[in-house]
Amino acid sequence: MGLWMIQSVRRELGEQTGTRPSFPELIAAAQEASSFAGIVSTGDDRFLAPKSMIKEVKAACKDGGKPVPATSGEVMQTIYNSLSHDYQAAIQELQSLTGKEYTSINIVGGGSQDMYLNQMTANATQLPVFAGPTEGTALGNLMVQMIRAGEFKDLADARASIKKSFTILECDPQ
């Protein structure tokens, strides 16, 4: 589900108040509620297209016997708790299926800018998170084309060029 839940809450809060909160404002609200322990399964179909993401998060908490968020900050913290928990479960499942032990997580695209989620993911997985570049999809496409055209000798060469050309932020587990 990823950042869809966050985007939906942002849109909904904007409709309620007439002013759409910024992502930094949503993060600040979540941080103020950082001790809130609500959690839901972000992969649940109920979050695909609810009329109200806020009400759906609250209902899922209630249905799961978890603390029900009362503020927008608690709703946001529930989503952050849930995403980082689900990322940790996905890493465990991936390691189990592949027999490989992963030593880090790379996050690209717009979500790589959410350093609060990146830090929570590092903490939940106990793996360092490397965030960026934000234009990961376009760069990946370009990288493949440049490898094919002989501009890079292989994937490792292309990755090294990306790493030298863009800022990649690191979040270590705490």
Model-identified regions with their sequence ranges:
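Glycine-rich Rossmann-fold phosphate-binding loop(s) that bind the pyrophosphate
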Residues: 110
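Active-site core segments that coordinate phosphate-bearing ligands/cofactors
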Residues: 1-104, 113-137, 143-173
